[in-house]
């Protein structure tokens, strides 16, 4: 489609050498003005497409960020003045007539890359100026391409886009909800959706077969680099499917999104179970861009005389090559003491370290407590060589894994947007994770509607914490993009799971009746997934903070500066029951 409008013939960034001699009209903002002698001035004219140089009469009054309309002739730049850094750098606009469409006050910060160094709260206060910059224009357009690609990918797989309600009953999904008071019923509240989870399952009961939505969700959680009160996700649900069907459909959308953002197909999406991810990487969000995999050293120390290891349920080890973190070797014991303190902060009782000397011998205060066979077996199990550092945590299995997993990231993890893209599906999560200390009941791993793994159903009553779920997460560069599961479609099985959570049949009817009752009318087997578009776009755009890919994000401290956060409401505007 042409960019021509009633006010312009071209966009600023469109002009090329092939346009030389053409008379064109452009509209945009004055990015920079440079005087050239007494009678000429160069204006860099900018719009969302790029920048072009315009040669104007020196008497023309046009300053930074003024909105102007320029009509001129496309000409080649004189020899020696071509700007290879601009797409329009071979040409300029000469014989220009300029019309001022709107004057502007001097901006509070440069509308270019220099604004990256400006305090973020200032950028957010003047977000409408910040978004004029090339970086922000690029990010928002990447986001638009990703959304379009996702819609196309889902539609071609016969998914139907359906909008679900924003006002819904309050349900316990794990995070704090935003509540909206009812005007009709005093003391009653709607909740803004943390996800369309319940609605999309009802759509499967309704026979829609395949649903999707690019949904706005809201959770009253603390803000951080990868979290906002409001976030956008691809939400999808499918009937008559198994795990592989859901993963294939979502993978297709992810590949389409990555291709739209980067122009290239992403690498194949890897697969591993939750147990494997924890064992090898110490986290259910493994970053596969670098090594330092964990090793199970428990068999190495079976029957050991070393008391710290003898009483431990599990012993995990990690080899840190000298080249991976040379400052550890350079700073010696002080750096190792810091690692030990960090391990304790993460919940470990302590950290055992051993260095491999030039002769292959293990050097450590604890080395003398290990037998020759144990030292040799440890070196063999980890593949350690001269100059390497071995870190070991002996504790409960989950503690040993997570502590070493975090140390792994502390030592070697690159920024999330750097390096290759490493996608991985993590499957077979636990149905329940730990026990709620207040109730003594298990806590749901993902949410209460995940279907138990068929192979583990017989263990549901006797060993609920050992039951796997048909649940899965998609992880990119150590960031969880989203999660999903095959859902419980049998009412009685759903009630069994609720009972484990301490939700009685009566309580379930009261809290989830609007959701459970339709399942009595023939709910099909179904499953789905949701992934965060903000996080995906941030990584694909090379950003380490999702605020950089959201037009008007929120921060903890921006209420007074932006006027776009919460505000006080007068008593007269408060809702009252009718």
Where are these regions (language model features)?
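Class II aminoacyl-tRNA synthetase catalytic cores and aaRS-like
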Residues: 1-563, 570
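Single conserved hydrophobic/aromatic residue that forms the stacking wall/gate
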Residues: 564-578
